[in-house]
């Protein structure tokens, strides 16, 4: 069977994702759709609106055949590491094609990536008032004429770089984003496709009726179930503030992505008087030209999870394929992939795995449970992959 890969967050799953799945199959002629999906935390360092099992269920109900978790050590990273992790997993599964949405679908991202090795030493990197990502984009534009600034284009460039770095045989296919831009914050009543961020914003404002036209039935069911959502703002900040108050500067400095004195700035703002009263006000107080919002949020998540640099480096050297769910077709493909993949396939997590290979995912799952006020809703231990059939859904035994 021929498989096409999708790199996803599904936060939440919406009609644009259905279009993506349909186009992926049409463009490649694939028999099986495999989604590599972020777990309980997404790339920007925020908790997903719904847990990974709820989002897996929605994906399987709407055309995906196999869902593999993108481990936290890849999922909560800058775009180039996020993309490399996803391509590494899809390559290990024997996926031939990856289809992605792009703001500029006619661009040859693989050719663009081939020109990139000469970029990093350019003049743009001497500018002190830019982030690394901004400097990189500026230098790339000066050498290639293409301005890399839209989120999906940045990820596409990351996929292309990863394919070159990993010597992967995967072929890339871009499809043009339709109806909604990545950062759109609103949508009209007659739209059938809206951005995930605009859907989250509408839900935050309590506008359930408004989102009915832009999400499938399964997502509506999930939205209606308060048991699956995260109360992020009110729950995250007290935990983080306590951590910043009690850790020493030396301890904070060991956290992954804590660099250039960021630990001093975080502690000073958190301990100031009267001090920020919310997570968002804290982020805004910390923000500077040197750090993007996403960079700060990722670092704060790793602070709360107490992830050290050496722990992250070790985890990234030991990837695995965590199976979250499959259809009958996905299960058949998986049975074949087991014979050829070089990465461990994990379908059930026990205490040993939770303390070893999956330690970071396990901790992230526990934190998500805490934020969602669902202490009994296990995210990893003893959870089985979802086996989706049209007749019924079950956790595979």
Curated annotation (Swiss-Prot):
EC number: 6.3.4.-
Record has Cytoplasm as a keyword: yes
Cited InterPro entries: Rossmann-like_a/b/a_fold (IPR014729), tRNA(Met)_cyd_acetate_ligase (IPR008513)
Location(s), subcellular: Cytoplasm
Origin: domain of life: Bacteria
Keyword ATP-binding appears in the UniProt entry: yes
Entry binding sites for ATP: 7-20, 101, 152, 177
Catalyses which reaction(s): cytidine(34) in elongator tRNA(Met) + acetate + ATP = N(4)-acetylcytidine(34) in elongator tRNA(Met) + AMP + diphosphate
GO MF annotation list: ATP binding; ligase activity, forming carbon-nitrogen bonds; tRNA binding
GO cellular component terms given for this protein: cytoplasm
GO biological processes: tRNA modification
Main location: cytoplasm
Keywords on record: ATP-binding, Cytoplasm, Ligase, Nucleotide-binding, RNA-binding, tRNA processing, tRNA-binding
Described function: Catalyzes the formation of N(4)-acetylcytidine (ac(4)C) at the wobble position of elongator tRNA(Met), using acetate and ATP as substrates. First activates an acetate ion to form acetyladenylate (Ac-AMP) and then transfers the acetyl group to tRNA to form ac(4)C34.
Record family assignment: Belongs to the TmcAL family.
HAMAP family: TmcAL
Name under which the protein is recorded: tRNA(Met) cytidine acetate ligase
